[in-house]
């Protein structure tokens, strides 16, 4: 919306990707949606069945209308220089153990961003799940954030 009204990229100072972006994968997406469900076996099982049906219907509608999945759309938008300036430093924080977003997808997005001229830093954490890198190693996590933030103030 900002870009549409101003004709300029979003005036951000730094860009941190924590556990993403990824691409839609049926069961990974269902796991992500299920994360907020109650732990009760019966409720969780019933809700999961309903999620599978609803998600399948939504995917069919997107496909029938020729629309990109919103997750794919988001990933594409993040690498558009008319929306996000290339001189803004960005960090990708991710892990191989994430069962919601595959690490190769994060690395592919970072590589594409680098090809396009973005300033990219990729930080692979070991043994952490989706968006749980900070609790596992808060010193390293906040060090990355601080470093990216500080690098954003150099002369551009």
What label would you give each PLM region?
Residues 27, 102-104, 153:
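Short linear functional motifs in flexible/disordered or boundary regions
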Residues 2-8, 80-81, 116-117, 153-156:
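Alpha-helix termini
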Residues 1-50:
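Serine-dependent carboxylesterase/thioesterase catalytic core
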Residues 2-5, 112, 147-148:
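A generic secondary-structure signal
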Residues 42-43, 109, 151:
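N-terminal pre-domain and mature-chain start segments
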Residues 30-33, 73-77, 145:
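Generic structural signal of hydrophobic/aromatic residues within well-ordered alpha-helices
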Residues 135-156:
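Catalytic active-site module of serine/aspartate enzymes centered on a nucleophile-bearing elbow/loop
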């Amino acid at each position: 919306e900002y870009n549409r009204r101003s004709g300029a990229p979003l005036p951000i100072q730094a860009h941190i990707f924590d556990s993403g972006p990824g691409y839609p994968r049926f069961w990974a997406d269902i796991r992500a949606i299920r994360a907020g469900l109650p732990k009760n076996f019966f409720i969780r099982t019933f809700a999961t069945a309903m999620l599978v049906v609803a998600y399948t219907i939504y995917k069919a509608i997107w496909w029938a209308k020729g629309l990109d999945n919103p997750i794919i759309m988001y990933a594409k938008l993040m690498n558009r220089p008319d929306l996000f300036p290339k001189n803004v430093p960005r960090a990708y924080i991710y892990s191989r153990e994430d069962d919601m977003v595959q690490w190769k997808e994060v690395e592919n997005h970072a590589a594409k961003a680098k090809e396009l001229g973005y300033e990219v830093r990729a930080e692979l954490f070991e043994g952490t799940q989706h968006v749980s890198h900070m609790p596992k190693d808060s010193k390293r996590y906040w060090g990355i954030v601080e470093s990216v933030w500080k690098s954003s103030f150099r002369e551009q």
